[in-house]
């Protein structure tokens, strides 16, 4: 693939991965390795293997996972390329048995076309608000509990998505189609053999976002909006990067269901020192006029190699145990090892 197309692909990826916090953002994925490249066609393979031990109230749980992804690109001409991407996540929690109930989550499955004016894809992909929550979602394990995204703004299937980078301005937009259902004369979902007509589930919606980088000042701002059925929300975010220091804040407001108001805000800070990185976040949210999230988390990450790290993360749960259940108000300690490939 020629240099023009590579530059286009890199700039588009920067919009999607929150590159403005590179080196401090511990939650993102690393770029994969090119395993094939010839005659304008390339294939990258990437992912992670992550061992995660969670401790709450002295009780342990295995939250380990493996992600594997494939990114294929084909040059059509000097300003146009085709792209396909798949990522799956495998998790296991056997509860001390040789169980067969492990799960595979198809996180991404999409294909599309890109060029000078951005990239358009269809399939299971991110909505437009993920790049806004990336401002404060910078920790190795905890964080991002107060900026809840409605389904159409998150990672979902049956979605037509666009992303583009125009100088210092990055934009994203997505539209999710309602899912077709076969129904009988009474409107009940049935097999197509017994159906009288087609209907849909009413889960269509859209999301929009934009991020602007103020040159080399280290200052970035972002805004986004999403709407789906009886749900809607908007988000505003800002960040400042000064060498090895990073600060960010996010505010969100909307309705998670009809007459169910939701308001949240997140604050994040990070510091990189040699091969170590330290991050902290505060999250607070209110759902239906009741506090649904209130926590402070801090973690430390050490890179033995660029693709191998260890981390320890602790979340102080500030929810009142008299108003929330004992389980919902517990603190959490997490210890992890992560290998990126």
UniProtKB/Swiss-Prot annotation:
| Gene3D superfamilies assigned | Porin
First and last residue of the signal peptide: 1-21
One Pfam family named in its UniProt record: Porin_4
Biological process annotations from GO: monoatomic ion transport
Q: Which UniProt keywords are given for this protein, alphabetically ordered?
A: Cell outer membrane, Ion transport, Membrane, Porin, Signal, Transmembrane, Transmembrane beta strand, Transport
CDD domains recorded: gram_neg_porins
InterPro entries (alphabetical): Gram-neg_bact_OMP, Gram_neg_porin_domain, Porin_dom_sf
Q: Which residues cross the membrane?
A: none
Where does this chain mainly localize?
membrane
Recorded topology in the membrane:
Multi-pass membrane protein
UniProt key word Cell membrane: no
**Record-level Gene Ontology MF annotations:** porin activity
Q: Name one GO cellular component term.
A: pore complex
Superkingdom of origin organism: Bacteria
Compartments it resides in: Cell outer membrane
Q: Which family does it belong to?
A: Belongs to the Gram-negative porin family.
Record PANTHER family? OUTER MEMBRANE PORIN F-RELATED, PROTEIN YDDL-RELATED
Q: What job does this protein perform?
A: Forms pores that allow passive diffusion of small molecules across the outer membrane.
Q: How does it assemble?
A: Homotrimer.
Return the protein name: Outer membrane protein U
Species this chain originates from: Vibrio cholerae serotype O1 (strain ATCC 39541 / Classical Ogawa 395 / O395)
What lineage, starting at the top, does this entry show?
Bacteria, Pseudomonadati, Pseudomonadota, Gammaproteobacteria, Vibrionales
